[in-house]
Amino acid sequence: MIVVSDTSPINYLLAIGQIEILPKLFGNIVIPASVMAELKSDDAPKVNLRWLEKLPTGFEVRSAKQLDSALNLDASEREAICLAEERHAAAVLIDERKGRAIARQRGLTVVGTIGDWRKPPRCTCSTWKLL
């Protein structure tokens, strides 16, 4: 299963040392190029930079082939939604209210960092039972 992530879910999970849960729950995590840029910005936490030095198995960076400039969102949310559509992702991980609403309007399954993980999309792994 492919899931595309916006910046905030990755930031939060890195901050609490739980980033490895994403590929265990969802399989392949696609990180948009604009999200990668935010994760390694000058003011990014050091934990982000250490993690990005060697991107673990289960994570890959991709650029969207086309960005919908009509989406009134920041660059990372826009690219996450467009990439999720292009890759026919099972879900998009996004926390911001406006981005979540637009993703849902476009027919995407939306998962947030906390609340929506009760039933991850098509999760078949036994890891979920451990949470």
Provide a role label for each language-model segment.
Residues 1-91, 97, 104-108:
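Active-site-proximal, substrate-binding regions of enzyme catalytic domains
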